Amino acid sequence: MALDKDIVGSIEFLEVVGLQGSTYLLKGPNGENVKLNQSEMNDDDELEVGEEYSFFIYPNRSGELFATQNMPDITKDKYDFAKVLKTDRDGARIDVGLPREVLVPWEDLPKVKSLWPQPGDHLLVTLRIDRENHMYGRLASESVVENMFTPVHDDNLKNEVIEAKPYRVLRIGSFLLSESGYKIFVHESERKAEPRLGESVQVRIIGHNDKGELNGSFLPLAHERLDDDGQVIFDLLVEYDGELPFWDKSSPEAIKEVFNMSKGSFKRAIGHLYKQKIINIETGKITLTKKGWSRMDSKE
């Protein structure tokens, strides 16, 4: 097993030694027996016995070695974001571009289960192979991210809102990485809710440190924060899929019954929301704008 482990989870040149039905038989550099299903070949490749070709080596669920010419973005030597397919009591199952899903064990996920990733989230991982040739996903550690992020030493991104994903979630704050490689820390005081591990979120940049790491916030700028009446209207809009059958000509009685505020307060609040481009005011209704929905995406 120790010899097998050397090639599992990596890209290797293997010799084609035979064909058995629709399965090619390959030989590894240490004499490992590896199988290749024809469905895992490049369309323009014809394999010849005795020749060597480049393959990615992975184990099936029984630990038997297989090869593919469809190279994954993630190997045991490379980290990248992988899409979460589902979660269960064993952990999160991710797609790394192989014929089989890969498990990130529950022990590696946050202790608070509400912070576990959901299907469609993306985890920053590499591949880990155990002594029995079982393959798992391993989350990136802080030291790994330290060596792969893109440093920023100016204020060009200040107040910009960018998309990023948490790779580490702690009570003290959220650690995120963007597609451009920016490393962002959001202190607990700069968020109202804690994002899930791997969740795509919008974060506003508020500064940087000497190492080129960015500081971010999930809170709006002070002048964009909603007053109590505006927050009531905004929360109801979110609850009712972004549309409410009320506008500035609605009756005071209906406004009082639904929003528990006077018509004057309601008109001031929707006027403020409109000026901030959070809502549109149409005949007979108010609707959330794209910017309005983004406040939810930013955990504001």
Curated annotation (Swiss-Prot):
InterPro entries assigned to the protein according to its UniProt record, in alphabetical order: CvfB_fam (IPR014464), CvfB_S1_2nd (IPR048588), CvfB_S1_3rd (IPR048587), CvfB_S1_st (IPR039566), CvfB_WH (IPR040764), NA-bd_OB-fold (IPR012340), WH-like_DNA-bd_sf (IPR036388)
Source superkingdom: Bacteria
Keyword terms, alphabetized: Virulence
Role noted for this protein: Contributes to the expression of virulence factors and to pathogenicity. Involved in the production of hemolysin, DNase, protease and protein A.
Family in the record: Belongs to the CvfB family.
Name this polypeptide is given: Conserved virulence factor B
